[in-house]
């Protein structure tokens, strides 16, 4: 309790009113630049929560969820030791991770990850398998969490389902309705999910910029920006699974979504402007998966993604006026195919190998139309149609050496072809788990990866915000980054976890602002740095106090360094150490029925490129009530009670001088979940990580 009160007081004291989630296309792009990454050993003395299986740490999610208010997968993942919510991005031991659904590939950026994971009921989760290094057979690289949501064949034939309604209030209200249904009969499963999110949002951004130009003039730009938006988001899925035998299964699924957004941005101060956005996003995905009892897997998937949007800008700046409309569009067609094989060999050895091929067609364009007298020419129209081909060949092996040692290694060779790049890459992975005794587990991991920019980022586009004073532009010359990561994981007494890691990223890229000298514009653009490196330590310590309080303290310490010798005319080489602490407390008020959650987080100041990021923190409280023979759950909560979770970045570096102040509102909400028929949801997610946001 003392720790809780200290953390609450610290979070209340931090002067960090800040960032709300960006809603428009321009602001979501601009916000990208501010912060983004054995023999079974079980817990004794209580029901097992985590066990070590080779290179995996497997968590019993129903046990972790029992006393928590999480009703969706996003909130459920935050209960896993080492997973934190870093300003809207989930991280594992301070780094980004992949999400797998029943071993299938799932990769998203922070915004898409939030939206899709929040649409999935937490009740579907059986286990979560944490892999700090993911073997090549899973198609992804780096750290991963595999979610086990296989259907429960022990349930009787008939219908099962879950209905959810939710209301969240910040400055404006958002509503959500979700229905998920499953029909089980003998060897056949048919499922259908639908979710509708809708409501309004409001946020403000106050920006101060001391802007020097080549003509010797200096402009003191002060703007106050208010943005109002209205959203409707629809997500649906239909799936069919037929199990011929235990290891012989055919699956067919269709997933679709349709989202609309209407936003208006009004700017006052040195810049006066009205800026209206309209966006529609449509996605259709069909996936066929066939698993044979011989260990062979066949998979084919087709995805269609279409995002038209418009912008209407009328603006008066100190240097002139802008009046024009913008139409932009991205259309993606993607095909994926996978053939894999696994063998169980003598002596406890395992062997897996396979080949993957994907073809993506990206059709993007942007057109400008003048609607008045402009003192500056708008950018030229752009048009692009290009294909991307990826061939991946992999092989891996795993084995148990004696009673104390497990290892798994894999190697993937990948050929990437696009108009910008033609190259082969090799990705080794290695994981070694050593168990000297039942109370100690040591795991050493190594992985390598290459990150490719979003398709839209590579286009010659320009999107305006802050009344046209800010420009978000593409970079066709942006190079992919190469990442190398090593971790050492130590599990003590089956519950205390400690992780040490080192990351090195060559050609690291991130979006950064720059006050141009030739004209009065702040340009936001993704650029390659020389490198980024990071040393980190994490400790996760759970503690139970009788039968009335369960607590877990997670502390992360990081030393990071970023170097860019070609950052316009102000190269930088910056390093900083920062610390983040997270304390979760769950009070049992009435066993099996009523629980109180009180959580807090605090983070010290940090750097990103030439940004200085101040300290931030938050305190959240929630009440969970289970009733109606445990079929209904009511959750009432208030997040960020003291409105201190936002980050207001400052730039005072070289000839760059800027400060941003983002609105920050506490969030209150209520959700009600009703389940019938012993419902266990299942879902397959679609990779839209590199599509236009």
Model-identified regions with their sequence ranges:
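Outer-membrane beta-barrel signature, preferentially recognizing the C-terminal barrel domain
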Residues: 450-499, 504, 524-536, 541-544, ...
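N-terminal periplasmic accessory domains that precede
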Residues: 29, 73-76, 113-115, 140-164, ...
């Amino acid at each position: 309790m003392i720790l809780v009160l200290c953390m609450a007081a610290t979070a209340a004291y931090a002067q960090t009113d800040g960032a709300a989630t960006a809603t428009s296309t321009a602001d979501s792009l601009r916000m990208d630049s501010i912060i983004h990454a054995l023999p079974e050993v079980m817990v004794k003395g209580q029901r097992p929560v985590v066990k070590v299986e080779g290179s995996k740490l497997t968590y019993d999610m129903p046990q972790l969820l029992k006393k928590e208010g999480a009703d969706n997968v996003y909130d459920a993942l935050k209960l896993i030791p080492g997973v934190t919510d870093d300003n809207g991005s989930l991280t594992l031991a301070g780094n980004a991770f992949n999400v797998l659904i029943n071993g299938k590939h799932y990769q998203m950026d922070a915004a898409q990850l939030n939206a899709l994971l929040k649409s999935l009921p937490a009740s579907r989760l059986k286990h979560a398998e944490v892999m700090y290094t993911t073997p090549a057979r899973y198609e992804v690289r780096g750290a991963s969490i595999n979610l086990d949501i296989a259907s429960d064949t022990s349930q009787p034939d008939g219908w099962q389902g879950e209905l959810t309604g939710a209301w969240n209030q910040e400055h404006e209200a958002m509503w959500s309705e979700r229905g998920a249904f499953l029909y089980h009969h003998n060897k056949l499963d048919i499922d259908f999910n639908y979710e509708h999110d809708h409501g309004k949002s409001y946020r403000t951004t106050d920006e101060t910029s001391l802007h020097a130009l080549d003509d010797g003039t200096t402009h003191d730009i002060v703007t106050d920006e208010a943005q109002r938006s209205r959203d409707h988001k629809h997500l649906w899925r239909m799936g069919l699974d037929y199990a011929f035998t235990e290891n012989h299964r055919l699956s067919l699924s269709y997933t679709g979504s349709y989202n609309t957004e209407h936003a208006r941005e009004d700017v006052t101060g040195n810049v006066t402007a009205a800026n209206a956005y309209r966006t529609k996003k449509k996605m259709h995905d069909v996936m066929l998966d066939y698993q044979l009892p011989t260990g062979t897997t066949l998979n084919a998937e087709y995805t269609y993604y279409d995002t038209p949007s418009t912008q209407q800008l009328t603006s008066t700046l100190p240097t002139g006026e802008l009046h024009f409309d913008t139409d932009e569009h991205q259309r993606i067609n993607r095909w994926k195919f996978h053939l894999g094989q696994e063998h169980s060999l003598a002596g406890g050895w395992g062997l897996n190998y396979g080949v993957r091929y994907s073809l993506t067609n990206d059709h993007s364009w942007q057109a400008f139309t003048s609607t008045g007298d402009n003192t500056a020419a708008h950018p030229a129209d752009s048009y692009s149609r290009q294909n991307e081909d990826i061939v991946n060949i992999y092989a891996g092996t795993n084995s148990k050496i004696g009673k104390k040692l497990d290892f798994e290694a894999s190697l993937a060779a990948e050929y990437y072809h696009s108009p910008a790049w033609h190259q082969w890459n090799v990705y080794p992975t290695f994981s070694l788990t050593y168990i000297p005794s039942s109370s100690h587990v040591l795991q050493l991991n190594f992985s390598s990866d290459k990150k490719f920019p979003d398709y839209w980022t590579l286009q010659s586009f320009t999107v305006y915000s802050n009344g046209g004073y800010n420009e978000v532009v593409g970079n066709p010359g942006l190079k992919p980054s190469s990442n190398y990561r090593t971790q050492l994981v130590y599990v003590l007494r089956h519950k205390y976890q400690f992780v040490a890691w080192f990351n090195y990223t060559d050609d690291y890229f991130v979006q950064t602002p720059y006050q141009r000298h030739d004209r009065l514009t702040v340009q936001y653009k993704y650029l390659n740095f020389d490198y980024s490196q990071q040393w980190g330590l994490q400790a996760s310590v759970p503690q139970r106090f009788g039968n009335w309080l369960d607590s877990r303290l997670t502390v992360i310490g990081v030393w990071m360094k970023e170097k860019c010798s070609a950052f316009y005319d102000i190269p930088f080489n910056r390093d900083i150490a920062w610390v983040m602490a997270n304390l979760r407390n769950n009070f049992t008020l009435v066993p099996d029925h009523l629980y109180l959650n009180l959580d807090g987080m605090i983070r010290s100041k940090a750097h990103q490129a030439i940004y200085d990021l101040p300290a931030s923190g938050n305190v959240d409280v929630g009440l969970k009530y289970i009733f109606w023979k445990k079929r209904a759950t009511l959750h009432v909560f208030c997040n960020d009670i003291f409105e201190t979770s936002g980050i207001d970045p400052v730039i005072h570096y070289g000839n760059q001088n800027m400060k941003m102040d983002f609105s920050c509102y506490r969030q209150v909400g209520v959700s009600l979940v009703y389940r019938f028929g012993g419902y266990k949801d299942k879902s397959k997610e679609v990779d839209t990580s590199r599509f236009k946001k």
